[in-house]
Amino acid sequence: MDFTKEEKLLNAISKVYNEATIDDYPDLKEKLFLYSKEISEGKSVGEVSMKLSSFLGRYILKHKFGLPKSLIELQEIVSKESQVYRGWASIGIWS
């Protein structure tokens, strides 16, 4: 079964959110909940991915990579989506 981009992103966020070790990072849990809510309410996957990618990049560095593997996997997903979104946004600016 193929999943939509929304479903893939929500599944990846849920996987991180449900990790037992994430309870040690309440600020991260709060952001993950916020971004999953935005997707559920119909916000663009690209826009949410861009914001989440930026947040996760800083968060991962701040915590010296001492976070679960599922968070790194989520970062890979949102990084790809945010690059596509930024590319389309740039086309609109430069054309």
From Swiss-Prot:
Coiled-coil blocks: none
Classification of source organism: Bacteria, Bacillati, Bacillota, Bacilli, Lactobacillales
Gene: hiriJM79
Keywords noted in UniProt: Bacteriocin immunity
Function: Imparts immunity to bacteriocin hiracin-JM79 to naturally sensitive host strains.
Pfam families, sorted: EntA_Immun
Record-given protein name: Hiracin-JM79 immunity factor
SUPFAM superfamilies: Bacteriocin immunity protein-like
Domain of life: Bacteria
Biological-process GO terms, alphabetical: bacteriocin immunity
